[in-house]
Amino acid sequence: MDELIRKALFKPYLKLNKQSSETQQDSWPECRSLLILHEGDSPTLAYFEAAIRSRFPGARCQLVDTLTTPAIEVDKGTAIVVIRFISTEWQREIVRNIDDLSQVVYFMDDDLFDPSALTALPKAYRTKIIRRSAAQHRWITTHCDTIWVSTPYLANKYAHLNPDVVPAQPTPRLLAVTRPGKIA
């Protein structure tokens, strides 16, 4: 079944339609507002939120949980970073606002572009990930300006997409020392 899904829905990521040799990070307009789209409190958000924020110095950042937020109001020049998955409803929401966005970035910390990289996962979870990845495949290549990845391995594997490596930078909450509680 996984192989049928892969063959039917996945085409190799050859390039991003919006990406050109002239589109470099240095040429992006100044960003005053950043929306980080994520699904709930995830390890990916905890480990990469600070690193993503640091790429937009001076920008007002808003975390948008796409599981609980149905729509957004976008200021002109806002940048959006999509973490891992983007639902069909949110794909439409971004497209509705695309003319006001300075850039759309897709970030992945696992190899979601290659179903064969997921073979070690339990079958039900692997099938879910493959289906979700396939559902956003064409949208990413059409609407994202750039791809960010978490490791040099992913950057090398997808070098033809010119990805940037965003190293993990855990949120201060993860690094805070807390006192253990006592149970009476």
Task: Please provide the spans of the model-predicted regions.
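Donor nucleotide-sugar binding/catalytic pocket of nucleotide-sugar-dependent glycosyltransferases
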Residues: 145-178
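Short, hinge-like loop/turn segments at secondary-structure boundaries
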Residues: 122-126, 165-167, 182-183
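Short aromatic-enriched loop/helix-cap "lid" or pocket-rim segments at secondary-structure transitions
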Residues: 47-48, 115-120, 161, 177-180
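Extended catalytic core of nucleotide-activated donor transferases of GT-like folds
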Residues: 56, 62-143, 149-153
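N-terminal pre-catalytic "stem/leader" segment of glycosyltransferase-like enzymes
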Residues: 2-91
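Conserved beta-strand scaffold positions in the cores of enzyme catalytic domains, especially
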Residues: 61, 104, 163-167
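Intrinsically disordered, low-complexity linkers and terminal regions
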Residues: 37-38, 139-141, 158
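Nucleotide-sugar donor-binding and catalytic loop/hinge architecture
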Residues: 24-30, 173-184
